[in-house]
From Swiss-Prot:
Keywords: Disease variant, Lipoyl, Mitochondrion, Neurodegeneration, Transit peptide
InterPro entries in UniProt: 2-oxoA_DH_lipoyl-BS, Biotin_lipoyl, GCV_H, GCV_H/Fam206, GCV_H_sub, Single_hybrid_motif
GO BP terms in the entry: glycine decarboxylation via glycine cleavage system
Gene Ontology CC: one annotated term: mitochondrion
Organism of this sequence: Homo sapiens (Human)
Name the UniProt record assigns to this protein: Glycine cleavage system H protein, mitochondrial
Transit peptide: 1-48
Gene transcribed to yield this protein: GCSH
Disease / disorder: Multiple mitochondrial dysfunctions syndrome 7: An autosomal recessive disorder biochemically characterized by glycine accumulation in body fluids, including the cerebrospinal fluid, with an elevated cerebrospinal fluid/plasma glycine ratio. The broad clinical spectrum ranges from neonatal fatal glycine encephalopathy to an attenuated phenotype of developmental delay, limited verbal communication, behavioral problems, seizures and variable movement problems. Death in infancy or early childhood may occur.
Keyword Mitochondrion (UniProt): yes
Length: 173
């Protein structure tokens, strides 16, 4: 019993980091780095995926040569409640700036333009039954199409998120 009490008191002191003697160090905690430990930063395609924007308010993220395309928050707010999405068929080949579909809302209709050249590999089927996803989650569940990129260097011509925010401010003035 006395040993159990000593262990309990020691555990409490270790928790508080008030160990009475250096001869009895606290056991290492699994989440702490030991002496001489090295921490590494891992980078991978998911971490390096950056959202890029066009002047027509489409965005694209890329991973392993596949681009996911949607519209920006600014665009969905300007449109209002989206009630219909017209999207291309899988296999459609697009050049940069080609019109590939349209969004209709209670306020307006807006054409969609491809931010990059490539071939449509997937469309967001959920938008057929729930086009409002574009409003609710324009950067996640409200994406429009996925496409293979035929010219990945075109990404360099698109705006970063920071540059896009400056662009939005300039057109709102």
């Amino acid at each position: 019993m006395a040993l159990r009490v000593v262990r309990s008191v020691r555990a409490l002191l270790c928790t508080l980091r008030a160990v009475p003697s250096p001869a009895a160090p606290c056991p290492p905690r699994p989440w702490q780095l030991g002496v001489g430990a090295v921490r590494t930063l891992r980078t991978g395609p998911a971490l390096l995926s950056v959202r890029k924007f066009t002047e027509k308010h489409e965005w694209v993220t890329t991973e392993n040569g596949i681009g996911t395309v949607g519209i920006s928050n600014f665009a969905q707010e300007a449109l209002g409640d989206v009630v219909y999405c017209s999207l291309p068929e899988v296999g459609t080949k697009l050049n940069k700036q080609d019109e590939f579909g349209a969004l209709e809302s209670v306020k307006a209709a807006s054409e969609l333009y491809s931010p990059l050249s490539g071939e449509v590999t997937e469309i967001n089927e959920a938008l057929a039954e729930n086009p409002g996803l574009v409003n609710k989650s324009c950067y996640e569940d409200g994406w429009l199409i996925k496409m293979t990129l035929s010219n990945p260097s075109e990404l360099d011509e698109l705006m970063s998120e920071e540059a896009y925010e400056k662009y939005i401010k300039s057109i709102e003035e």
